[in-house]
Swiss-Prot record:
Protein name listed in UniProt: Uncharacterized membrane protein OtCpg00060
Keywords: Chloroplast, Membrane, Plastid, Transmembrane, Transmembrane helix
UniProt-annotated location(s): Plastid, Chloroplast membrane
UniProt KW Secreted keyword: no
Main location group: plastid
Membrane topology: Multi-pass membrane protein
Length: 537
């Protein structure tokens, strides 16, 4: 599960605690401006919170980009509004939005436009008061390992926080008068100052780690790393680099485990002492903190074993991205959208193995029954899947292209003489299907069934027994068909001795064979006449 539970709890607390200050602002409006305006403020806060949650939960990243572009300015505006509300509660002054003195009929809305204004003010304050930059950057640079565990932890943490706020504030504001403030709720100085203290405490928690460096440098770094502006600046993100060793020897470089999959398995990593972490501003630092389990330094054997499993046997990034689309809880950087060439090569290898089933996995004698006119061509090699075989079969790419042209451009025919019908059937090798524009999962490809080979003889039969059986069959055929050799030659003997395929056509018989056949016919006629003298007459 790696860091899924921790990230779920942190994100749940972040989304739950983010509207702390807006909740206090809604309470302030309820106390100083009336129940109806307080209810609109609470409704706007809830609507803003649900909207922000939906933007991230359903992966509407491009809408979040617009919010992230102006986040520093929104933080400043939200802070000014919350501080003003805290001062109003502390000194018991009338709010700048207050239109009438409290009393009978106080707090009533003058028009629908005014009610919409109160609702939108609380709705916008929800986006102007994030957990400074800590919330958005934690959301951007944290990737859960198990989405189900992550969502479970996120839901538990988030629901608990929201339930507490609703039970303590929202329910009472929408229900009866808040009993904690009594009948004179707007005139109790001590009670109202509690709201001011709560607002200041919420601001202190949210801006505890906020510095000018975080508002400027870190935000600019994340802006270039996670949004469409990443093409404006050449930068390194999410990884570490291999530095040259002390003796200036050449060392291999690897930035992240994702880049490792595209580059292939490394056979030599170099000494661990040559590894130096160089975080690039805030992006790589947060990635190292949140994904230390993923960024491990192992020995060459262990690392190659893990990389080999991940690349050839385990789930790859293409499938992982397809599974996590509905729960895209982080902005997808540019490198996530690139084509994974290794993934396409894996699909091609799967397709090649499926096509190879067309050539039966059997003995050469059995395969010969369904193969083309040559028994030396066992299978066709895809050199893109198996490039190491090119040196054995074709010395150059030109020779390889000629081989492919020959195989693809030749129509193979096979006749079913062994079945006795002598019918020509056109056949060819299966070709790799073009990959679709959007590759989903490997098992979406159609299954190619292997060719069914009919074995004519038992594996326990010997050549002598087969030949003896063939002689007996020929004698029976000679007797029942009267003169079989006038029609065709001995088919079974021809297959056994010569292994030649082709249509069986009538042929002329020489004089010696003709004389022998005539003698046999006369002998049978004389034997028949001598045994049946009456019928002969």
């Amino acid at each position: 599960m790696e860091n899924s539970i921790g990230l779920g709890l942190i994100h749940g607390l972040m989304y739950g605690i983010v509207p702390v200050a807006p909740w206090f602002v809604a309470l302030k409006r309820y106390l100083l401006e009336g129940k109806e305006k307080g209810q609109l403020a609470v409704a706007g806060t809830i609507a803003g919170q649900v909207t922000l949650l939906a933007l991230t939960f359903f992966g509407w990243s491009r809408v979040l980009w617009v919010w992230y572009y102006f986040e520093p300015a929104l933080i400043i505006l939200g802070t000014m509004a919350v501080v003003r509300c805290a001062l109003d509660c502390w000194v018991e002054q009338e709010s700048s939005l207050r239109t009438a003195a409290l009393g009978p009929g106080a707090g009533q809305l003058a028009s629908k436009q005014e009610g919409l204004y109160y609702f939108l003010m609380s709705f916008g304050l929800m986006f102007c008061n994030p957990l400074h930059l800590e919330g958005s950057q934690t959301l951007l640079s944290s990737i859960p390992g198990n989405r189900y565990v992550y969502l479970l932890a996120f839901t538990v943490s988030y629901t608990a926080i929201i339930f507490i706020f609703w039970v303590t504030l929202g329910y009472r504001i929408f229900g009866k008068a808040y009993s904690g403030f009594g009948a004179q709720q707007t005139l109790n100085r001590y009670r109202i100052r509690r709201v001011s203290v709560g607002i200041v405490a919420a601001l202190f928690l949210q801006f505890a780690n906020c510095t000018p460096e975080a508002l400027v440098i870190y935000h600019w770094d994340s802006l270039l790393a996670y949004t469409p502006f990443d093409g404006l600046k050449h930068h390194r993100t999410r990884g570490y680099t291999w530095e040259p060793s002390s003796d200036n020897a050449f060392e291999l470089s690897r930035q992240s485990y994702r880049a490792t999959n595209r580059a292939g398995v490394s056979f030599e990593q170099g000494a661990k002492r040559a590894v130096q972490f160089k975080p690039f501003w805030n992006t790589e630092t947060r990635f190292d903190e949140c994904n230390q389990v993923r960024e491990r330094e192992l020995s060459n054997e262990d690392w190659n074993a893990e990389a080999t499993f991940h690349e050839f046997q385990g789930i790859n990034q293409g499938v992982l991205r397809a599974r996590s689309v509905p729960f895209n809880l982080y902005m997808v950087p540019n490198w996530e959208k690139q084509e994974d060439k290794n993934y396409l090569l894996t699909l091609r290898q799967i397709r090649d193995e499926m096509d190879d089933k067309l050539m039966a996995e059997s003995s050469p004698q059995e395969r010969f029954l369904v193969s083309p006119f040559t028994d030396n061509l066992d299978y066709e090699v895809d050199y893109q899947v198996y490039p190491e075989l090119m040196a054995e079969k074709a010395q150059t790419k030109t020779a390889y292209a000629d081989m492919v042209k020959l195989i693809r451009g030749t129509k193979w025919t096979s006749n079913h003489v062994h079945l006795g019908d002598g019918t020509d059937v056109e056949m060819s090798y299966a070709k790799l299907h073009a990959l679709p524009a959007e590759v989903r999962l490997p098992w979406h490809y159609p299954v190619v069934k292997p060719t069914e080979v009919v074995v004519q003889t038992s594996s326990t039969d010997t050549p002598d027994s087969v030949q003896l059986l063939n002689d007996e069959l020929q004698e029976n055929l000679h007797f029942f068909s009267n003169e079989p050799e006038r029609i065709q030659q001995n088919v079974y003997k021809r297959l056994w001795e010569h292994r030649t395929f082709g249509k069986v056509t009538p042929r002329m018989i020489d004089d010696k064979v003709q004389k022998r056949l005539d003698d046999r016919v006369n002998m049978r006629r004389e034997a028949y006449v001598s045994s049946n003298p009456t019928k002969a007459k």
